[in-house]
Design a protein with these regions (language model features):
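Short linear motifs at secondary-structure transitions and domain/linker junctions
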Residues: 43-46, 72-73, 114, 122-124, ...
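Active-site cavity-forming subdomains of large catalytic enzyme subunits
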Residues: 89-135, 145-147
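Charged/polar, solvent-exposed surface patches and flexible loops
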Residues: 13, 17, 37, 58, ...
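Conserved thiamine diphosphate
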Residues: 4-5, 62-64, 119-169
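N-terminal leader/propeptide and maturation segments of large enzyme subunits in energy/redox metabolism
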Residues: 1-48, 52-55
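A generic structural signal for ordered alpha-helices
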Residues: 46-49, 54, 66, 114-118, ...
Length: 171
């Protein structure tokens, strides 16, 4: 049974459009404006419909798909939190991850880490690190549903912004 709010009304089309667009950040923003316009301009006599409209007005911020970002350093991503990161990547959820790869444990004063390249000298690795750098990007790509970009923040800020936009748009 259809709710009286949408039965044979233009709202039915608007709500269907939202259902089709709710998983896209850009599309859900566009369609949510139409939903908000429709509910704010509606006048209904049914008490249940009025209550529903008021609840939708209170929660209108939830109509737009949220962008979710996890931001951390390489010590977390490559080592301490890798199990959790791997779990999130394997889940298939639409989550973006930004890893600041300094190639050392920055919080410990520069010790070599799993992100330190082979032969690099660091604290407690004065003769150079013996093992090669863990390839986190390749490991993430093995899931097949992950967008990976590697950028040099100091080299080209436009490339960084482009990668962030591409990550956000990737489904």
């Amino acid at each position: 049974k259809q709710h009286p709010l949408v039965k044979n009304s233009p709202m039915k089309t608007i709500f269907n459009d939202w259902l089709n667009a709710k998983e896209s950040g850009v599309d859900s923003r566009r369609v949510s404006e139409a939903v908000i316009g429709a509910i704010e301009g509606s006048s209904v006599s049914d008490q249940e419909a009025k209550k529903l409209i008021e609840e939708m007005k209170e929660r209108k911020d939830y109509l737009v798909k949220r962008s979710q970002w996890i931001v951390g350093g390489d010590g977390w991503a490559y080592d301490i939190g890798y199990g959790g990161l791997d779990h999130v990547l394997a889940s298939g959820e639409d989550i973006n991850v930004l890893v600041y790869d300094t190639e050392i444990y920055s919080n410990t004063g520069g010790q070599a880490s799993k992100s330190t390249p082979v032969a690099a000298m660091a604290k407690f690795a004065a003769a150079g690190k013996r093992s090669k750098k863990k390839d986190l990007g390749m490991m993430a790509m093995s899931y097949g549903n992950v967008y990976v970009a590697q950028v040099g923040m100091g080299a080209d800020k436009n490339q960084v912004l482009k990668a962030i936009r591409e990550a956000e748009a990737y489904d």
